[in-house]
Design a protein with these regions (language model features):
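C-terminal output helix
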Residues: 106-115
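Active-site beta3 strand of CheY-like receiver
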Residues: 44-50
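Receiver (REC) domain active-site loop signature in two-component systems and cognate sites
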Residues: 55
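Short hydrophobic/Thr-rich beta-strand motif most characteristic of the beta2 strand and flanking loop
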Residues: 25-32, 40
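Charged docking surfaces used in two-component/phosphorelay signaling
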Residues: 15-23
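Active-site residues of response regulator receiver
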Residues: 52, 82
Length: 120
């Protein structure tokens, strides 16, 4: 069973994402922001990180950069799931090391499709 770290400062969004992922057969650990996610990622292995962009303490791009600094996370897929859809933000995501960029509101089937594509 693949494990996913789901990061979002919105409790309702975390629950919606977790419900979708667990329903598709994934193990999910939730984090409330980038700092919380970074600490959890240091403590255990995840097959994929799915993160919001705009969060307190550490945003999604900051988390992506920080994870990519460590060899342990060089190849871990990181998807950013956010309301931000500008080409400049997507480019910033690629430069930070994000594997992909998905826009909220999200289609649950599309989310699962993208995750399956990048981790299997």
């Amino acid at each position: 069973m693949h494990s996913i770290l789901a990061v979002d400062d919105s409790a309702s969004m975390r629950k919606m994402v977790s419900f979708t992922l667990v329903g598709a057969g994934f193990k999910v650990v939730e984090a409330v922001d980038g700092q919380d996610a970074y600490e959890k990622a240091q403590a255990q292995h995840f097959d994929l990180v799915l993160t919001d962009q705009n969060m307190p303490r550490m945003d999604g791009l900051g988390l992506t950069r920080k994870l990519r600094e460590h060899p342990k996370f060089k190849t871990t897929p990181i998807l950013i799931l956010t309301t931000e859809s500008s080409d400049q933000m997507k480019q910033a995501g690629r430069q930070a090391g994000a594997t992909g960029w998905l826009v909220k509101p999200f289609d649950p089937h599309r989310l699962i499709e993208v995750i399956n594509k990048v981790i299997r």
